[in-house]
Amino acid sequence: MELDLGLSLSPHKSSKLGFNFDLNKHCAIEGAASCLGTEKLRFEATFGLGNVEENCYMPKQRLFALNGQPNEEDEDPLESESSIVYDDEEENSEVVGWPPVKTCMIKYGSYHHRHIRNHHHCPYHHRGRRITAMNNNISNPTTATVGSSSSSSISSRSSMYVKVKMDGVAIARKVDIKLFNSYESLTNSLITMFTEYEDCDREDTNYTFTFQGKEGDWLLRGDVTWKIFAESVHRISIIRDRPCAYTRCLF
């Protein structure tokens, strides 16, 4: 082991191997270094590796040279930007914001745009719950009220049936308000209808005519005009001072 590595510090053994130097002396260390350097040069000269280090450092020299000079193969930054803008103009001519607009919002925007564009060509203009038909052949626009409630105009309906109830009578009736033109005619017809088949008619009986309006409030006859009553009545109740039954049925 000591012979192979030559690490023995004994001068006797080193003289046998042909190395006459002492590792403890500085001059001996320099001599060994020069010897090793000579052997290295011989080895490189033998195998033709004299330019190995130069070849290894050549790419680094090229890199340093390229860092100081512009690369001829690189494109001009202005040309690259112009080509990018040109491609974007070909693909999509519209302005796209960031973040991108969702597909549902794009569809809604296109639909809203078409709806507004068609609205200007439509002869009907919507204003709240009223529709005004603009006709060039008619001097005055026609106005109609939109609504499915019973408070619509009585002239626009063919019939208007209202439920009627009288105190002491178990069965309610329905009458067409459009067949009457005043409170008196309606009251007389209702009293006659209820007392004709009921044994409840008395001369000293007083009747109170009440009705329920469109807002749900109960009103007396005469609180509003007949026209408003005919348009807003939902239910009628006739109260008797002396009913046949001792219970009063108001609904």
From Swiss-Prot:
Induction: By auxin. GO terms for cellular component: nucleus. SUPFAM superfamilies: CAD & PB1 domains (SSF54277). The keyword Transcription regulation applies. A motif (EAR-like (transcriptional repression)) lies at residues 3-7. One of its GO terms (molecular function) is DNA-binding transcription factor activity. GO terms for biological process: auxin-activated signaling pathway; response to auxin; response to cyclopentenone; response to far red light; response to herbicide; response to red light. Residues 159-246 form the PB1 domain. Keywords: Auxin signaling pathway, Nucleus, Repressor, Transcription, Transcription regulation. Homodimers and heterodimers. This is Auxin-responsive protein IAA29. The lineage of its organism: Eukaryota, Viridiplantae, Streptophyta, Embryophyta, Tracheophyta.
